[in-house]
Amino acid sequence: MKQQMTKKTFFIAFVVSLGGFLFGFDAGIISGVMSYVGPQFDLNDAQTGWVVSSSSFAAMFAMLVAGRLSDRIGRKKILLAVAFLYALSAITSAYAISYETLFLSRMVGGLAFGAALILAPTYIAEISTAENRGKLVSIQQLNIVLGFFAAFLSNYYFNQFNISGSEAFNDENVWRWMLGVEFFPAILYFGLLFFVPESPRWLYTQNQSDSAKDILKKIHGATQAEVEIQSIEKNIEESEISKAVSIRELFAPALRFIMIVGITLGILQQVT
């Protein structure tokens, strides 16, 4: 019998995937910022490139450690840290007084979205049923696109305020508004995460099975919760067995082509 998606499951997935919205917003907003920041800070081409790409550079390192760190202290704690870093990056970027402070502030945001891109899909997969997992995880991708759209729309309106001659949105200030407005969805994200439970699967790995069962019952109901509990227990057992598998297995003939295709698609997505 097909399991229907509950409103609670959708709400949790939507809240967690707001990190994707902030990623898209952060990545898109910089396109409007640089036409003002460049002349104000007298940036050369290399510095301009670093301001734009610094967040992606920092995200690379966050991706390497976010998964392992969340295994130790929990998915929810890392997601809360992600929301906090987004808010901190927005405020410090808006008040940047030099190339260096803007560069470092952007890197803080990069740490946030690097961790979010790893953890949000993982968390959503861990709280959803097999029937609805694909649909719920895809909310993350939808929110990334919506974030880009919101960023371009925000840039448009701030540019219109600048053109209108408003003193508050002059050339020296308008880019600060562009960057600072991200603080509001970041704080909303932070607040909503307190209504999100810890990952049941992570709780199981920490020998907190009773808490995990309670969460699953609240999300899916008692009947489906039993199915999910069995699935989690089986998955954890299989994970323990697979720990002995070396990373060199990725280069085995059976997986090599799949890995190359996956990496190529990721590179092409970023290049375009």
Predicted regions and their residues:
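Transmembrane-helix signature of 12-pass secondary carriers
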Residues: 1-272
